Amino acid sequence: MIQITLPDNSRREFPGPVSVAEVAQSIGPGLAKMTVAGKVDGKLVDASDVIDHDARLQIITPRDDEGLEIIRHSTAHLVGHAVKQLYPTAKMVIGPVIEEGFYYDISYERPFTPEDMAAIEARMRELIAQDYDVVKKMTPRAEVIEVFKSRGEDYKLRLVEDMPDEQAMGLYYHQEYVDMCRGPHVPNTRFLKVFKLTKLAGAYWRGDAKNEQLQRIYGTAWADKKQLDQYIQRIEEAEKRDHRKLGKELDLFHIDEVAPGVVFWHPKGWALWQAVEQYMRGIYRDTGYWEVKGPQILDKSLWEKTGHWQNYRDNMFTTESEKREYALKPMNCPGHVLIFKSDLRSYRDLPLRYGEFGQCHRNEPSGALHGIMRVRGFTQDDGHIFCTEDQILEECVAYTAQLQKVYADFGFTEILYKVATRPDNRVGSDELWDKAEHAVMEALRRSGVDFIISPGDGAFYGPKIEYTLKDALGRQWQCGTMQVDFNTAERLGGEYVTETSGRAHPVMLHRAIVGSLERFIGMLIEHHAGALPAWLAPVQVAVLNISEGQADYAASVAKTLQNQGLRVQLDLHNEKITYKIRKHSLQKLPYILVVGDKEREAGAVAVRARGNQDLGAMSLESFVQRLVQDVADKR
């Protein structure tokens, strides 16, 4: 007898080996119809897989996260089925599940077009309507090779070569189409009805730009239509908020092909940059950091000492002068150690906190570049704290408080916290790691926040805290970090005089709150949909005259506002006032002031707030107080 224990601890007995689907059928026909797969003793298996021993079983349905992932993976296979029917000479490569969807990489003689994508989606729906079973066959390695060789699937053969130890592999048959996968997959195409192909892109075999280019078809799949509709709505909203689109519409920045991955900031974009940088400079000042500035080009000997030259050189921009090799710095840490060791330091000097708006360069692949979010040249709010082991806890508590204030001021209210602990390969004693891990976790506990632990994900030189933001669309952005480092200061000869007149290497805490300013500004643009709060807005108020007779008064209003340190745009163009109001409203300005004869004579302004709110007439003094208060309150 085979005894199956279900999640509620009830048991069912069967006279012999039994499939997951048969167990589901014994429970009820409704569950059987919903069965996507099973989890046997914690391992996912196909619904057709047979259980031949006493086991715990969970039936997986589309309502389970695992079920949804299986549906997405099977929909990727369905893409392959449709593509091979429509384009028989196409070579299928790989089709994994990604967050909220899937993609399939395909080798074909020409790029796919939007019309091709529509045809593929239509064929997929025709295949789903046939309601066919997906058949799994565990197949000996030699036979797998013959199957793909006979079909001319060169990439599948290369993938088989990558798995020399696999003597049998799962082949999944969609009618005449066959694909290779560890599985599990859905038992029938009826589970695949709620899907949509979303976009086309280029890709490279094995993600290497030196290899052949492939076509990538992206898609999404869900358990029900409501979920799909919500997803499409989120994507459409994300497209409206795309920082690349808004950056152009609001005249903030552009990226030119002469400088891929490096940003050209326009006047309004640079005003936004300055608002962020000056705010962060104030944070440095208020929390005991000394602002420093290091060189951008450093000799290769330094990078050899840090290990970057040996392990990171492909990601660095290098140059040569007078028979010496140099690199543009990809990070600021070594420079801060050199500043630290430029003088004899005492334990009384610790903790010593340096902060820099350090410009870094990394040679990112061109295919990975994305607007100002993923660039080659970027500036970080990079800070390093040199301290003793006993000071780690207090510094982490103080840093977390800083970070929470900064994120709240920028409009982010939800933060996720993660602690990455010691990996197998590491420097430092277990006692030192115990102390450091306790310090970073206790710092978060004292901050009153929940956190998750990611075992083994710390760097070899110390544990770290990762701070992840959620934006207005619920997307997650890993921004802040607090990285404990037992290694770099020692490696570069940084030391201080101890209380007993000995010498010791300081612990180095790497910290960034916004990280890359370029990326953070991209996040701000998308989070606020371009309608930045008044304190950040590149132009906080526009002053418009109705006719030429109020030009001088409008100019004096603008001057008064500028004298208060406000960012003002004066528009004296000879255009209809309705046109001028619309023009500046589309720029998402916090305020528009209109002045006509009535306002001029009263020394007043007619105020319109963002969102087409007519606040009526008020004295210029009252408006100045209002806007200055908005800025002070970070509104």
Curated annotation (Swiss-Prot):
GO terms for cellular component: cytosol. CDD domains: TGS_ThrRS (cd01667), ThrRS_anticodon (cd00860), ThrRS_core (cd00771). Keywords: Aminoacyl-tRNA synthetase, ATP-binding, Cytoplasm, Ligase, Metal-binding, Nucleotide-binding, Protein biosynthesis, RNA-binding, tRNA-binding, Zinc. It catalyses: tRNA(Thr) + L-threonine + ATP = L-threonyl-tRNA(Thr) + AMP + diphosphate + H(+). InterPro entries: aa-tRNA-synt_IIb, aa-tRNA-synth_II, aa-tRNA-synth_II/BPL/LPL, Anticodon-bd, Anticodon-bd_dom_sf, Beta-grasp_dom_sf, TGS, TGS-like. GO terms for biological process: threonyl-tRNA aminoacylation. Pfam families: HGTP_anticodon (PF03129), TGS (PF02824), tRNA-synt_2b (PF00587), tRNA_SAD (PF07973). Binds 1 zinc ion per subunit. Zn(2+) binds at C333, H384, H510. Its EC number is 6.1.1.3. Residues 1-61 form the TGS domain. Its cofactor is Zn(2+). Residues 242-533 are annotated as: Catalytic. It is an enzyme of class 6 (ligase). Belongs to the class-II aminoacyl-tRNA synthetase family. Catalyzes the attachment of threonine to tRNA(Thr) in a two-step reaction: L-threonine is first activated by ATP to form Thr-AMP and then transferred to the acceptor end of tRNA(Thr). Also edits incorrectly charged L-seryl-tRNA(Thr). Homodimer. This is Threonine--tRNA ligase. It comes from Variovorax paradoxus (strain S110). The gene is thrS.
